[in-house]
Structure formats: structure tokens, C-alpha cells
């Protein structure tokens, strides 16, 4: 499981999933919910891509840890969904705040974007988690077992 190939595949799958998901979802939130201009949102997404590349695999490891805890707490499917939301919100919100500060968003825009992102994450539930699981299967991450709570 810890061979260089499987770690590389795991990192690439996690990176692909995070860059695609965060680019699409956060741009929609920034423009339509938080009132950022298209230019501000594009700047934010351009800053976010290298950040997402750096944090994607650590996030995947963090999520897997949260999933193991959730699996021990309850085998129910809702536990996986709740764990996905918790992992995403607690890991991504601080990173998102820093990105928005970097591109010059004001505190009102930051609060709107981050709170909207939290609400959207809760409403979409485990969409990112399912997408991440799909990407891991797509990239044939060796010895990967779909995270089930």
C-alpha cells in the first residue's frame, strides 16, 4: 500500500479531484452568492490552483482519518456523509479565507463566500467525498478501499 507508485497515484487522484471540484464550486459561489466580480473570482481560482495542489494529498489523508473515526462511531451511510462534510469544512475554510485575503476580497465578501461555502458543503453533503472516491477509482489507486462509514 505504501509503495511509491501507490502514493503517487493517490496524490495525483486527490490533487485532480480537489482542483476540479474547488475550481467549479467556489467560482460559482464567489460570483453568484458572495458578489465578487468575475475578475476577482478568476484571480481567486488562479491563486487556489497551486494551493489546492499543495494541500490536496494532505486533505485526502485528513479525510481518510475522519472516515476511520466515523466508521468506528457508526456503520450507517449518514455517518460517511457527515464525516465528508466535517472534513471538508474544517480543512478547507481556513485555506479559503487566506486565498480570499490574498486576492483582495473585503471581510464582507470573505464572510459571505466562506459561510456560503459552508452552507453549500452541507447542502451538497458528501458530493466532494463521492467525487474523490470516484477519482481514486479512476486513477486506480492501489489498495484503495472506498471510504464507507
Swiss-Prot record:
Keywords: Amino-acid transport, Cell inner membrane, Cell membrane, Membrane, Transmembrane, Transmembrane helix, Transport. It is found in: Cell inner membrane. Its main location: membrane. InterPro entries: Ala_export_AlaE. Disulfide bonds: none annotated. It comes from the Bacteria. One of its GO terms (biological process) is amino acid export across plasma membrane. Pfam families: AlaE. It is a multi-pass membrane protein. One of its GO terms (cellular component) is plasma membrane. The chain crosses the membrane at residues 16-36, 46-66, 85-105, 112-132. One of its GO terms (molecular function) is L-amino acid efflux transmembrane transporter activity. Belongs to the AlaE exporter family. Exports L-alanine. This is L-alanine exporter AlaE.
Amino acid at each position: 500500500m505504501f509503495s511509491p507508485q501507490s502514493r503517487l497515484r493517490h496524490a495525483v487522484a486527490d490533487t485532480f479531484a480537489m482542483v476540479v471540484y474547488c475550481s467549479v464550486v467556489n467560482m460559482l459561489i464567489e460570483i453568484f452568492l458572495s458578489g465578487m466580480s468575475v475578475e476577482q473570482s478568476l484571480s481567486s481560482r488562479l491563486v487556489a490552483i497551486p494551493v489546492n495542489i499543495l494541500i490536496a494529498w494532505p486533505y485526502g489523508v485528513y479525510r481518510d482519518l475522519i472516515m476511520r473515526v466515523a466508521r468506528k462511531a457508526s456503520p450507517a451511510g449518514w455517518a460517511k456523509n457527515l464525516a465528508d462534510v466535517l472534513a471538508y469544512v474544517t480543512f478547507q475554510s481556513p485555506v479559503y479565507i487566506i486565498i480570499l485575503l490574498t486576492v483582495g476580497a473585503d471581510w464582507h465578501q470573505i464572510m459571505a463566500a466562506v459561510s456560503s461555502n459552508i452552507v453549500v458543503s452541507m447542502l451538497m453533503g458528501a458530493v466532494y467525498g463521492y467525487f474523490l472516491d470516484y477519482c481514486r477509482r479512476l486513477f486506480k489507486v492501489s489498495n484503495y478501499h472506498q471510504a464507507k462509514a
